[in-house]
Amino acid sequence: NVDFFDPSTKLESDEKKLLQKWEINKEKKIILMPGRLTSWKGQELFIEAVNLTKIELGYEAFHVVILGSNQGRDLYKKKLVRLIEQYRLTKQIKFVNHCKDMALAYKVSDIVVSASIEPEAFGRVAVEAQSMEKLIIASNIGGSNETIINEKTGFLFESGNAHSLSKKIIKAITMDETSLKLLGKEGRKNIIKKFNVEKMCFSTYSEYKRLLN
């Protein structure tokens, strides 16, 4: 819904409240990885890439928020925590179980990552992030190939490759603000063009018509 995921509808006061709740300083870049905690969503790969990025850029360069419930997958969550501890990333990576306003979560972030290691038919995160004018970094499988214009509205990385993901994160973090905002604007234009209600209704109607004929 491009009207709900619209950056102009979010208040600065609400952004500040969310950042206070998350105990995050906005002076650093914020990388958001939304999605339930499950192995195929690629959280392990993402943590590996964050470690590689930290080695390249240093501890102080960015914050990371992994946003999503483990839905009872306690062993998997513990595995992720151990990996974070192993890489000494506990001060940099924060788990957030739930956010009732996902559009606001995107708004306070600078970069959004979708690191799925199995293809997703649609890939909602990539669409929502672009709609919120945020740079999206996603694996080059599944729906992301269709919804992201590589290097124009986001970055695609080689699926399953932590080094490839890290390179894209570093590229995003080191972009100047003007380029970052321009890329975000292109992302929203892309999503409005592809997914406005009238176009989706027409596409659905055309598909039904084709099937009936």
Outline where the language-model segments fall.
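A short helix/loop element that forms part of the nucleotide-sugar donor recognition site in Leloir-type
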Residues: 7-24, 80
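A short, well-ordered alpha-helix in the C-terminal region of glycosyltransferases
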Residues: 20, 164, 171, 178-194, ...
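A conserved mid-protein helix/loop that constitutes part of the nucleotide-sugar donor-binding site
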Residues: 29, 33-55, 78, 163
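Glycosyltransferase donor-sugar binding loop
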Residues: 34, 63-78
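Short hydrophobic beta-strand element within catalytic cores of glycosyltransferases
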Residues: 135-138, 148
